[in-house]
Amino acid sequence: MIRDICKDELFLARKAAPALPEDLPIAQDLLETLIAHKDGCVGMAANMIGVAKRIIAFESEDGYLVMFNPVILKKSGPYETEEGCLSLTGTRKTKRWQTIKVQWQNEKFQPRIKTFSGWTADIIKHELDHCDGIII
């Protein structure tokens, strides 16, 4: 189900709770909402659709990927950039990393670890900021 985009900064500033297997329908809604906004959006966190759970979805080189309970294990190559967000107006300056190593769970809640770089690393970090209640 495609959901409305949450623009409530007080809600967006809350840290997300860990995702559980019963949150799979939320992930499906998140993915459907992301695809519906694909012309202006490459990633979303569950709080962007009004659910404070640690779930992100984004477009990668291999298609769309959903991560449950993602965390950054390692990061390198800090730099400053400017980003926009469907939940916020305009663009804002923020710090990002050239390379990040991420641990997450897939839709079967099996652990995964992968290193991402460039644009994909930026997207993941932006969505993880949402999960951590950080507003760019």
Identify the residue ranges that each predicted region occupies.
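Positively charged
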Residues: M1-I136
